[in-house]
């Protein structure tokens, strides 16, 4: 590539402890995610997320993740947590996603067999700030810890995209080189158990992403 500088953004998702949030900031992570999807084992209450928000470093985005939540549930999180970005993982349509007047990412299920078309995505969600490609099947949730075939990511996207699904310190270097994403999103790959992050794996994940960034420029 002709760039003199290349930097993949990093999002740590499924945060449940203030100490993990604080370490994410120290490691230079760009965003932390709180999950409000009802069926998630990493779900936190809005009041819990608000308390953890105090540990977030300046210039780190706060992402609120939803999956088929009601509008009132989303609004409660907006009032209580004050996220900077929303992320929708369910069957939410464009009208629902844009109704909160907030930038949002739309998660795209890559666990099925149906081909994903860039033009179709951009027509379906024209106001999306970007897309997140995850390994869950249509109708399922994220955080599976299983990767999908990165070659299935559609070409021709005119919006930034994040790569998710089964990423960990062992494979994120290859993932970045294979897909050149705007960002990577990890949850289970840096955990001891759901919601409990491992400091060593968090640090190693960041180091591997930065190593990949340097390799892109070679």
Swiss-Prot record:
Alphabetical keyword list: Amino-acid biosynthesis, Aromatic amino acid biosynthesis, Isomerase, Tryptophan biosynthesis
Domain of life: Bacteria
EC number: 5.3.1.24
Pathway this chain belongs to: Amino-acid biosynthesis; L-tryptophan biosynthesis; L-tryptophan from chorismate: step 3/5
One function term, GO molecular function aspect: phosphoribosylanthranilate isomerase activity
One Gene Ontology biological process: L-tryptophan biosynthetic process
Pfam families (UniProt xref): PRAI (PF00697)
TM stretches of this protein: none
Catalysed reaction equations from the record: N-(5-phospho-beta-D-ribosyl)anthranilate = 1-(2-carboxyphenylamino)-1-deoxy-D-ribulose 5-phosphate
Recorded family membership: Belongs to the TrpF family.
PANTHER family registered for this protein in UniProt: N-(5'-PHOSPHORIBOSYL)ANTHRANILATE ISOMERASE
Record-given protein name: N-(5'-phosphoribosyl)anthranilate isomerase
Gene source species: Stenotrophomonas maltophilia (strain K279a)
């Amino acid at each position: 590539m002709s760039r003199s500088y290349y930097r993949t953004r990093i999002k740590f998702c499924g945060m449940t402890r203030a100490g993990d949030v604080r370490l994410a900031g120290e490691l230079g992570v760009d965003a932390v995610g709180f999950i409000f999807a009802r069926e998630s084992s990493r779900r936190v209450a809005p009041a819990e997320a608000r308390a953890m928000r105090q540990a977030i470093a300046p210039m780190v985005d706060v992402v609120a993740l939803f999956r088929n939540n009601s509008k009132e549930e989303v609004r409660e999180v907006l009032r209580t947590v004050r996220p900077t970005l929303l992320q929708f993982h369910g069957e939410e349509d464009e009208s629902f996603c844009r109704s909160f007047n907030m930038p949002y990412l739309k998660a795209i299920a890559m666990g099925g067999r149906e081909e994903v078309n860039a033009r179709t995505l951009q027509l379906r969600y024209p106001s999306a700030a970007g897309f997140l490609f995850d390994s869950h099947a249509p109708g399922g949730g994220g955080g599976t810890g299983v990767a999908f075939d990165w070659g299935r990511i559609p070409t021709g996207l005119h919006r930034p995209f994040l790569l998710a699904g089964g990423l960990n310190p062992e494979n994120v270097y290859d993932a970045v080189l294979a897909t050149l994403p705007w960002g990577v999103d990890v949850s289970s790959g840096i955990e001891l158990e759901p919601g409990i992050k491992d400091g060593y794996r968090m640090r190693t994940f960041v180091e591997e992403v930065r190593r990949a960034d340097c390799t892109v420029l070679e």
